[in-house]
Amino acid sequence: MSDIIRIKRHFYVHLLNNNTNVTKCMLGPQVYTRKEHERCLFEPRQCVVVPPGHYCVVQNPCVRGEDNIPKVGESEEVQLRMGEKEIRFEQPPFPLLPGEELLTVDGEWLFKLKVIPSNKGYHVRCTRDFVDSTRVSVRAGEQWIVEGPQTFIPRVEVEELGEVEALTVESNTAIKLRARLNFTDRQGVARVAGEEWLHRTSGAYLPAYEEEFVSYVRGAVLTEKEAIHLRALRNFTDVYGKARKAGEQWMITHKMSSTHIPDVNEVITATVNAIILSKNQYCIVKDPVGDEGINQFGKREVRKGECSFFLRPGESLVGEVQSMNAIGKNEALLLQALEKFEDCGGTVRMPGEKWLLRGATEYIPRVDVCVLERRGVIALDKNEGIYVMNTTTGEVRTVIGEPYMLKEHEVLWEKDLSPDVEELLACPTGCCRCSERDPNFTSSRVKHRIIRFNVQHNAAVQIYDYKQKKPRVVLGPNLVMLSPDEEFTVLSLSGGKPKALNSLLALQLFLGPRFSSDTIVVETSDHARLQLSLSYNWHFDVNRENPDAKIFSVPDFVGDCCKTIASRVRGAVAAEDFDSFHRNSAKIIREAVFGRDGNGHVRNSLRFSANNLVVTNIDIQSVEPTDAKTRDSLQKSVQLAIEITTKSQEAAARHGKERKDQEARGRLERQKLVDKIEVERTKTQWLELQAQSEVVQASGQAVAEAKAKAESLLIEADTELKQAEMRAKALRITAASDLAKQKQQQDLELEFAKRQNELEIVKARELAQTEVERIQRMVSAIGRQTLVSIAQAGPEMQAKLLGGLGLKGYLITDGKTPVNLFNTAQGMLGGQTTETKS
């Protein structure tokens, strides 16, 4: 490096004095001649330039005095603060003094100042004590938030921990904050560590470091139909200025505020909807709140419409909102007193007392009255009824054929029947087979309705009265109604073939005539066992005027009758051999069943005196041996007879078939001959037609050519004729079109001229009218007297002028201007006439 160092403006170099080992800084612009004991440590460097909005960090900065000039030691060396850092902001370019260094991060030494936007801040912490211009003293470890909008000015004593965003507090929303330590917030309120509070102001809020965000608290919207219940968590004064005790509950409605944000010292226990009662509604409130704001536990209150209210804390609704009891003319309410009270009519009601409130009226029950049920008039036809029990005496009676309303001491009594009777009543005929019964049958009968049963024609029903201990028999057709103490007599009859016990249940006994069938097994004297299928016709001999209960004396009259007849038949058959019985079975069985009279004749009927049952006829439907051998021999004989009959029928059928075949073959041969004759006739006709065709074919070609040529000429002539017609038609259409066009044009021109003339006439008329109006308006504007004066002004002036000149008249003319002597003479005559008159 040369001894002459040229230092430009804003450049510097460091020179080391080898004698004193002290480095000094030379700042341009200058030209410096290096001495022998001095050494230039580097080429001239540009001064450090910090532009606006930037800063740099200088390590080991120099010590400056109050005048901001670096301090120099005894050896003229610059004093440094070793290990320190200094942040330098925008200033004139400056050199780095010996010992000073620029702090570089990732090769960059110039840093841009950070701008803190609105609603944001920087969380910073003090690393060592210092005194700030805004803070008297800042101790190491303190933390705070630098709020925007501003430019963040860094300090070496402060480190940046991170960026903090502001919290947005929306309308009807608050944020819950908690104190990290004891401090005084921005509103000047002293906060204790752990204390929580709400920030309710809408907008952006940047919490201080001492404030910890807990959560957002959304307010409850209060309307005419919604309110909230609150409970105090601790003693405090709410936002409405009212002192609250811990555990106290209260209600906030829309009358106090449209919205409510719950404080940290209170909690929403419930959101309640308004109970709206119309004019015809009411409700019962349990534990109502009194005038002092305290629940009256154990009490109830009836609230009637029209109104709307909210249930306060501790209150509850008994049941639901109920409609006012509108009692019709044929209705009543059964009421019961819960406590002793005096009603509006002055009647004292004792606890448990019941009474009826009859309509027509409207009724809202008191809190000490219980509505047991609504009763109405039960409409009953003449064949309908109900069972009514007196709850005081226990007596049960029937009400039939008239509308009835139960009294306060009466209830509907349900009459129970056995399952058999219930199922039989559900059957149309009043009877059913045991095999067809439904095990899951459930009666749909209304039990308090009187039990009715339609007795069919020619049937009887027995009803037993347990109170009077006697039965009664009803013959059909009739309608039976049971009193409370009566029951049906159920018949259990035998059924099937052979008869089986308890196969059929019935409420009514059919009197007949009817029939029964049975199958019995008998044995002849030669030990042939036979199975007989018998049918009996029977009926009951009953006095219609006074039926006797004797017909119901035998519960299973079918089984008893069949057993009796079977016994008699077996006895009679046992005395006969098989052949004799097979030939005379009907006579033997009829004689055995009916017996003989005193004259030895077979009777016509069998009478059972126990129940007046009469069997009038017996029919043998079939007789079959039960022994296999006997059955086989009978089957063989029957089969042999069938075979003989079948063979004779087959022979007759074969003979008839052969005869029909011969007749068919004859008809077929005859038809063949007829067909051959027809074929020959058709062939002859075909040959004749073929000959005619050949003749036509021979002369057809010349005729065809002549016809074709003639037709061609005819077509050409027709074509020319049609073309001429078309041309004439076209000319005619063109001429007609031109004529119509000219006519239309002339009509339009004539119409145009006519309208133009009319317009001219209208125009002239309107101009004349306008001129007349103008003259009239001018005359009316000038005035008649004025016009007269104007008209007389000329002659008068001339007369005066002539009078002044002493002339009677005058005439001025030359040789070129003619004189109208006629007018002059007339004027003269007029003048003379005037003078004569005057």
Swiss-Prot record:
Keywords: Cytoplasm, Nucleus, Phosphoprotein, Repeat, Ribonucleoprotein. Its main location: cytoplasm. It is found in: Cytoplasm; Nucleus. Pfam families: MVP_shoulder (PF11978), Vault (PF01505), Vault_2 (PF17794), Vault_3 (PF17795), Vault_4 (PF17796). MVP repeats lie at residues 13-52, 53-114, 118-170, 171-223, 224-278, 280-328, 329-381, 382-426. Required for normal vault structure. Vaults are multi-subunit structures that may act as scaffolds for proteins involved in signal transduction. Vaults may also play a role in nucleo-cytoplasmic transport. This is Major vault protein. The lineage of its organism: Eukaryota, Discoba, Euglenozoa, Kinetoplastea, Metakinetoplastina.
